[in-house]
Amino acid sequence: IKPSTLNFSEAAAFQTAYLTAYVSLVRRGNLLKGENLLVHGSTGGVGMAAVQLGKYLGANVIATGTSEEKLKKTLDWGANHYVLTHKDGEVDFRNEVKDLTDGKGADVIYDPVGGDVFDHSIRCINWGGRILIVGFASGRIPTLPINMALIKGFSIVGVRAGEYGRKNLKKGVENNEAIFKICEEGHFKPYVCKEFSLEQAKESIHYLSQRKLVGKVVVT
């Protein structure tokens, strides 16, 4: 079963990424039209999905990443702006995010990265904002100075998309129906940057390790 608007390679890149984005932004983050959404890791699969869903929901989408060349692609996916998280080898994005949000900061932060990126995210979140914990691609699980949550009134929200559906089967079905519907309407389009045959599986892993990925890689 796949959305009729996608070919099989695109469909292979669809389910997990877009379900994660939907559970994160709709179910857990309660993202509202007009809010400022900061998407970390925006050039990867789950980030790409969050950018596209954020646009569909009417948010002001700010995409982040470490490569300006890759980040330019996020504008095609619906991002309003993009911001480099690292400058001269140091994490530095919070002032730029505040500038893009009239000094308020992001209302919702979608974070599959963790590490230093999370540490700086708590400095550029709006009062009453929600930080969605999607993963730790940086390799470091961050800790939180809990007084920051009190001072800025923000929430830390964990996201496990698959478990969300297993705990509530009815909502799990509704989530899948929703992402298929949005896709069929033409609002979702997974970007597959490269395809490998099954015999090239080893090469596909090497390609991922070189950090060339934009969107998704598919092994067919």
Map each language-model feature to its residues.
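Mid-domain Rossmann-like dinucleotide-binding core that forms the NAD(H)/NADP(H) cofactor-binding site
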Residues: 11-87
